[in-house]
A protein has these predicted regions:
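Conserved catalytic-core motifs of eukaryotic protein kinase domains, centered on the activation segment
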Residues: 37-39, 63-70, 130-133, 222-223
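Gly/Ala-rich beta-loop-alpha elbow adjacent to hydrolase catalytic centers
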Residues: 98-102, 106
Length: 271
């Protein structure tokens, strides 16, 4: 596993790459977390047969904060940062996996990269512009997701909501480290309808999409996701694992198996 910082127009971003000749899979983390959340994928069975690329979004983990937060800290800005990472790595064909915020970034990338072979979205309901109330459950923790400054109790409560109990120490550190301007700007942009209509984007996409959520996710409206028409929904259904908002961590074995099967189907043209 090699790690290096890559210079992009959104700042220097920390990228880790397992290398090899396997199918490239870009993993994008969520709001106020870091690439470390995918530890059980990088160290688990998913790394066999795939080239895994994880990175810290601008304003997160070991990446730099954005010099121009108004432009970078939007779904479009973060999607552009991810696209630049792929360009610099020389990857023109890739499967993209995104969790929570990362899932929304991945959907935003659909119109930017012709070489996206498949999409895996976790905890990321594709909502219309101004449609957050449809896709998300009413939760006090969503307010924390959009606040610049968080108290220690808010950090703990937010961590429990997005990752479950116990809150892993690395996640608490990631929340504290993250640039609060990113949280604030993302929600400002969502309220004003910036970015693509995500429901329309997936409903018009010919890219195979795997939808994997936790059956006990406290933040998203699973029933809403079932109303979305994905033209190439993998296995013809949305998968629900025995977990909360982070099934890739709490149900890692089953999750990794599903993603491995999806990757194989994509490469064989069977997805």
């Amino acid at each position: 596993m090699s790690a290096r910082r890559i210079a992009t127009s959104h700042g220097r971003l920390m990228v880790e790459d397992t290398g090899g000749s396997g199918t490239p899979l870009l993993l994008i983390h969520g709001n106020s977390s870091s690439r470390e959340v995918f530890r059980r994928q990088v160290e688990g069975g998913l790394a066999h047969g795939c080239r895994l690329i994880t990175f810290d979004l601008p304003g997160h983990g070991e990446s730099e904060d954005a010099a121009e937060p108004l432009g970078t800290y939007t779904l479009g800005g973060l999607a552009d940062a991810a696209t630049q990472v792929l360009d610099i790595l020389g990857l023109d064909k890739v499967v993209v996996l995104g969790w929570s915020l990362g899932g929304h970034v991945a959907i935003e990338m659909l119109s930017r990269i012709r070489g996206i072979r498949g999409l895996v979205i976790i905890g990321a309901p594709p909502v219309r512009r101004g449609g957050m109330a449809e896709g998300f459950l009413s939760s006090p923790h969503l307010r924390s997701a959009g606040r610049r400054h968080l108290s220690r109790p808010e950090v703990e409560a937010f961590g429990q909501a997005v990752f479950g109990k116990p809150v892993e120490p690395f996640l608490s550190r990631a929340i504290v480290r993250s640039d609060g301007r990113c949280r604030e700007r993302l929600f400002q942009a969502a309220r004003t309808g910036e970015g693509v209509d995500q429901r329309l984007a997936v409903e018009r996409s010919s890219v195979p999409i795997a939808v994997i959520n936790g059956a006990a996710d406290p933040l998203i409206n699973l029933d809403y996701i079932d109303t979305v028409t994905f033209p190439k929904l993998w296995n013809g259904r949305c998968h629900r694992l025995d977990a909360g908002h982070a099934p890739f961590w709490h149900a890692a074995t089953e999750f990794n198996l599903l993603v491995s099967r999806f990757m194989a189907d994509v490469m064989e043209g069977a997805a």
